[in-house]
């Protein structure tokens, strides 16, 4: 086994096999793998690709390409090889033997990035569960990847020696994590019930990783969440209050970014977090319109929203980073959309107006009269409904207010009882 000198930034070789994919789609996938490697603090020193009718069952790529890979490892003094598709345990074991350095796949790379990003207890548990589900059937091929001293890409998370040999330990730990996550889910359910009782409207930012969701959240709500030009900068959900032009307030949540071929173990482990989307009243789908693959990113997110059974929730399509877009960009017109930059104040105001218009479509209009001594109802209307006009009618000694409210709320019932009858 080659003695690997740990660097602050690991030298990485990427390997991809083009099977049943168009050239452009395959090139985009390899480019995204390079971005993922950079996010994980790796430096790509070489790339090997091969077009085949099917992958080689024993080594993923053909024998000639394996030899080419071995020579490239020696030439570049690479520390790690990352394959663009999920490897079987036998393939990983054979490739370790041929290469003499650590070998991981796209799934393990993404899990590794998630492990480095998780901050909350729930996020850390979800990542660990996903990693354990991935590792369990592959222990025999993971020896070199997990034994690298000082860690490195692919070793963050549950990399103890015990996990290599003790499957029972892994299963016990998985059961323990699932029990802990169940308690978190129950807490989420109670929180959602409380939120519904308080008639709070929930918006959820969704989108491909690095589309600018955190920047939008910060700029719209004046919050201070992590903003980085990196994939998966946000992992733990963040919720802030957003004040709309009418004065109406809603809750806005940032969510983990989606990505093409998101590992199934990750989707399963993060299901409790992702299912928060299903509780939203409006999805704000953010697309980086400056990215050359924006259409594919948009389709990937729509597909995942459908898989999470959240496609029936109204959506507003936000084409972000308009200040960086090229002439190639053509917006999709099947959904309500806005083209904007998160750093343009006029665009931010236009987005707030768009959000308000979308919410009006889900609410009931009212024009009610509230007596001067019914201050508690007026206060509730100001807090829980979207008021457009408010005037004091001296002849009636009452306030005449006009606006929109959610139908199944106590305040709307009270306002309905006080609807203004025109004389």
UniProtKB/Swiss-Prot annotation:
Gene: hflX
Binding site for Mg(2+): 214, 234
Gene source species: Alkalihalophilus pseudofirmus (strain ATCC BAA-2126 / JCM 17055 / OF4)
Name of the molecule in the record: GTPase HflX
Record Pfam families: GTP-bdg_M (PF16360), GTP-bdg_N (PF13167), MMR_HSR1 (PF01926)
Localization per record: Cytoplasm
Disulphide connectivity of cysteines: none
Keywords in alphabetical order: Cytoplasm, GTP-binding, Magnesium, Metal-binding, Nucleotide-binding
Cofactor: Mg(2+)
Binding site for GTP: 207-214, 232-236, 254-257, 320-323, 341-343
Quaternary structure and partners: Monomer. Associates with the 50S ribosomal subunit.
Free-text function comment from the UniProt entry: GTPase that associates with the 50S ribosomal subunit and may have a role during protein synthesis or ribosome biogenesis.
Domain Hflx-type G: 201-363
Main location: cytoplasm
GO cellular component labels: cytoplasm
Single GO term (MF): GTPase activity
